[in-house]
Amino acid sequence: MAQGSHQIDFQVLHDLRQKFPEVPEVVVSRCMLQNNNNLDACCAVLSQESTRYLYGEGDLNFSDESGISGLRNHMTSLNLDLQSQNVYHHGREGSRVNGSRTLTHSVSDGQLHGGQSNNELFQQEPQTAPAQVPQGFNVFGMPSTSGASNSTPHLGFHLGSKGTSNLSQQTPRFNPIMVTLAPNIQTGRSTPTSLHIHGVPPPVLNSPQGNSIYIRPYITTPSGTARQTQQHSGWVSQFNPMNPQQAYQPSQPGPWTTYPASNPLPHTSTQQPNQQGHQTSHVYMPISSPTTPQPPTIHSSGSSQSSAHSQYNIQNISTGPRKNQIEIKLEPPQRNSSSKLRSSGPRTASTSSLVNSQTLNRNQPTVYIAASPPNTDEMISRSQPKVYISANATAGDEQGMRNQPTLFISTNSGPSAASRNMSGQVSMGPAFIHHHPPKSRVLGGNSATSPRVVVTQPNTKYTFKITVSPNKPPAVSPGVVSPTFELTNLLNHPDHYVETENIQHLTDPALAHVDRISEARKLSMGSDDAAYTQALLVHQKARMERLQRELEMQKKKLDKLKSEVNEMENNLTRRRLKRSNSISQIPSLEEMQQLRSCNRQLQIDIDCLTKEIDLFQARGPHFNPSAIHNFYDNIGFVGPVPPKPKDQRSTIKAPKTQDAEDEEGAQWNCTACTFLNHPALIRCEQCEMPRHF
């Protein structure tokens, strides 16, 4: 890799400049020449040098103008690294946290181990947490000799400074706004659940860099003495509008850093909006219960200004629902349709100190949230605009807010409000944020009103909008959005969704031009569980559509089966009807008896007719069948037979009878009984029928 002891490897120089942007280029080049372009050795040396330049202790008197011009542009990126989720694990690991997003190396991580870098395990995200130096200030936040005396105070990431004799070097590069959260905030329905900070300086013109969130936790040592963790003293949630990746804190803690197991550090995330210059950042701040102890904040007075920094463990919010949390957002002021802020109540029973601010160049307020505000001497020594959050207010403040819990910001005007440091920075009176629980409530909590926030800080250069909402869905009005606590509501609200919260805020004329920035912003989810919920919803919607298509197919199949069943039932009904009709055509028993008698009578008639036909054929044409029915009239007649009348027929028959008698042997058949009689008999021997009737 090295090209010689007298040459500089520009690739190594570029890597080191990105890893240590606060170190001047000439120092990095000199370090590379001394270490023969060895990356590990340069990282070890520059990690120590970076602390000096980061805290304003480096040598700024360079005779080389090219070095000075390079220094003005050296803060090009602040990078992050991920840390293990184990509370008591102190080493930097390569496992993914916060939604499996890889974080790059931080300026406070110390030495970068080349063989154990996360870049070998995961894809490196763009190391872009840019910062621009405003006009009239050098790269360390101090006014330049040629700059205007009334330039804007340089606000940013306060890291503290080591004690030196020079007051200008003691002045930190960034003027933070301190927000202290008192430990006695009551949890419940009226617990403040969201903190909106409205009012950030605009970005530098034509600046490709975005905003950053500088977060610094503080904690007091048990002995009362404070010290500064040099290379592990802070973490930054950085954001670049040109790269939509998100970077998460924290940096690698030192082995001496305390890890309160009950106080997990809140989760911080950033969001990439559609338009440049509309960057927002969100921090979820756990609120402690009344019984949970919380480490207070100490800001030591005097010239040392050293403080103990505690690096807490990150708790992955995606492991459960977001409960018991306060979300803080810092954004430009006077925005009608600002980006949406969603948060909920405290997630854990403990309080974690955190800081959230959004950087738009170097002029950004920094919010410090700790257990208690510093004393007056410490505030005078810092001489910076500060905001402290506590749960108590003065008696005068409580008189007007007895019916609603209020998170109140008041100004503590004192000697620090009028003091100026040697750098020309105007120190502003600190503002205190107090939480007012309601004085009167109906049993059962039905009459609990929504908590309010009052912000009064007349000397500050920035405008704050802080919204505190209870655990219930808010109403709708123009202003800053308060959270609703269902994940479905988080995803379904449109971009223009707003709430009805009485938000009292200060307007700053110096920041009025921020309104020219576009008002369109995306819905800020604020944590990885919302992204997971969004992906889950997409998956569930796709599954629902697939199931709906299957349901339609099943419905069609069911309709087809129903039609087939109806047709089969109709066929069965027709067959049954036909069968019933055929049964009805069969005659009954009485009808069959009648038909049988009719058939018998017809048979008798047929036989009679047949006999009559035979008789008619045998007797000739003069056969009279009616005379047969009268031959019984002569039976039993006594007396002589009357003589027949003499007529021609009788005369004709006489010779025939004579001829028959002459034959004596010709027998005759009786016409009635067909008995064969002797020819001499004139009557039938059986029926007495006359022979010639």
UniProtKB/Swiss-Prot annotation:
GO terms for MF: K63-linked polyubiquitin modification-dependent protein binding; molecular adaptor activity; ubiquitin binding; zinc ion binding
Zinc finger (RanBP2-type): 663-693
InterPro entries: CUE (IPR003892), TAB2/3_CUE (IPR041911), Znf_RanBP2 (IPR001876), Znf_RanBP2_sf (IPR036443)
Post-translational modification: SUMOylated by TRIM60; leading to inhibition of MAPK/NF-kappaB activation and the innate immune response. Ubiquitinated; following IL1 stimulation or TRAF6 overexpression. Ubiquitination involves RBCK1 leading to proteasomal degradation. Ubiquitinated at Lys-611 by TRIM45 leading to proteasomal degradation.
Modified residues (Phosphoserine): S372, S450, S482, S524, S582
Effect of E685V: Loss of interaction with 'Lys-63'-linked ubiquitin
Record's comment describing the protein's domains: The RanBP2-type zinc finger (NZF) mediates binding to two consecutive 'Lys-63'-linked ubiquitins.
Protein name (record): TGF-beta-activated kinase 1 and MAP3K7-binding protein 2
Native organism: Mus musculus (Mouse)
